[in-house]
């Protein structure tokens, strides 16, 4: 069984680490986070691995997962490459072995963020599961059937695909130059949805709708909209004043929302324009 070291073990790292441990695909070895306490919590959740908060403590591994925030991927790769170079000069073996695979979990950034590790002969990739990792325990139950975008060196993606297949995801290839737009699609599909739901609930609350009825409104409309989109597609599922060309109501309603919250008013106008364009398509 191949070993994996995990650097940065938040919600994504913990979910994937536990899934691979439970499925006996990877042997979770070392788990590195900024805080030893958080590393220990991650190890406890995964049921495997050794917690550390020092690069110098990391041991050789076949696979390295950098599950750190996007803004920290490049600097983490630099630090790891520097540490690996110093290890290679000492009595310790190269921590990745020849050749190791290193991948990060960003949906927006390409595997080129890991470029410093290429000097070690490592193969590089990125792997992005299209799943909301709001809670690792819940995410574990949702991995089955979820899509996973793989990008990077062919040898690395070829080796990673069986790992993600084992935990139930469905992999597909993605070109590095398309990652930003691809991830923006995911942001529109899921990340903005809670924002829109929160705005709707605020509007209902400030309109005097009782809390229990607002919750019922939210549940009914959300389920109805999702069901229609999945069954009919976005164009046929679209309803509302912009979709039916009621520009007068869109204007009046937009002004009312802008008075209530200027930023929400701008969002209303922008989304209404997009809705009208979609309806006309």
Where are these regions (language model features)?
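Rossmann-like NAD(P)(H) cofactor-binding subdomain of soluble oxidoreductases
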Residues: 36, 45-138
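Short coil/turn segments
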Residues: 9, 106, 152-155
């Amino acid at each position: 069984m191949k070993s994996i070291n995990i650097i940065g073990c938040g919600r994504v790292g913990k979910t994937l680490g536990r899934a691979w441990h439970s499925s006996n695909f990877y042997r979770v070895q070392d788990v590195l986070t900024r805080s030893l306490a958080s590393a220990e919590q991650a190890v406890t959740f995964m049921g495997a691995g050794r917690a550390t908060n020092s690069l110098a403590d990391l041991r050789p591994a076949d696979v390295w997962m950098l599950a750190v925030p996007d803004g920290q991927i490049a600097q983490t790769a630099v630090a790891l490459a520097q540490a690996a170079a110093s290890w290679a000069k000492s009595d310790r073996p190269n921590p990745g072995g020849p050749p190791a695979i290193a991948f990060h979990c960003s949906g927006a950034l390409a595997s080129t963020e890991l470029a410093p590790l290429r000097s070690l002969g490592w193969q590089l990739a990125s792997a992005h599961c299209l799943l909301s990792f709001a809670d690792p325990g819940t995410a574990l139950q949702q991995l089955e059937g979820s899509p996973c975008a793989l990008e990077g060196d062919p040898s690395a993606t070829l080796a990673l695909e069986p790992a993600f297949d084992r935990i139930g995801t469905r992999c597909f290839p993605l070109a590095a130059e398309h990652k930003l737009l691809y991830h923006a699609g995911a942001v529109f599909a899921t990340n903005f949805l809670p924002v829109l739901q929160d705005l709707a609930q605020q509007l209902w609350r400030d309109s005097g709708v009782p809390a229990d009825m607002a919750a019922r409104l939210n549940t009914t409309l959300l389920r109805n909209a999702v069901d229609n989109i999945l069954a009919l597609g976005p164009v046929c599922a679209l309803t509302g004043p912009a979709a039916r060309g009621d520009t007068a109501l869109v204007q009046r309603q937009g002004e009312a929302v802008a008075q209530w919250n200027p930023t929400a008013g701008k969002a209303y106008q922008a989304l209404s324009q997009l809705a009208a364009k979609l309806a006309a398509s």
